[in-house]
Amino acid sequence: AHGMLGYTVQVPRSGGRLLNALKWDERVDPENWQPIETLFQRAAAAGINVTHVAAKRYENSGFTRAVFRGAQYKGANLVADLISETKLALHKAPSFVYLYVNDLDTAGHSDGVGSEKWIAALSMIDQMVSQLMKEVPKGTRIWVTSDHGMINVQEKIVIGLDNPLMQGVSVVAGEPRARHLYLDSDSPTARAETASLWQEYLQDKALVLTREQAISSNLFGSEVSADALDRMGEVIAIA
């Protein structure tokens, strides 16, 4: 229902313009794009002091406004400051603090899981959590989680514009893990033929579905909003 379908998606009726969810686009209103009340807003309405602690550069980003609104933002770039802001926020009981650190994710995307950079980032986070456990108020529960898993990919598939797979495809969006293909024609025949062509080429490297197949498989939840349907690719290739 929230309509956040991938790293990049095509903005409906924009002439093929893509919205990068992390970099955003000032022409797109975050609260209109993602109108559903957030968990932070619901918690705040219930009387819980909600704080979002993360790097200063994320504070007014479109993604933050779309997904994390409802929390008081505390920007901090150094580990010591992240811990300090978290500790201060937890003294306002009842409280919930969402602390985001992107170092491990960045290292994994750039250098791979298990790389020296990744191990260093993991060690830093381990030390940070250990320090947090010593400094937060007694009785505080700490959950350590991640927004997604990560594996190292051995093969890179690059499809050029002159590739037969691109016939009838006007825009490619999404991300390497799941591509949204927007077609010149939104006919059932075009969707089925494109999905079949891509599946034959990719074989067991990906699962290629038409929009209808993805929806019927509940890949986007049991209820798909009109906005989500409007933004979804006619064909979706999932690694």
Q: What kind of region is each of these model predictions?
A:
Residues A1-A239:
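Feature captures the catalytic ectodomains and active-site-proximal regions of enzymes
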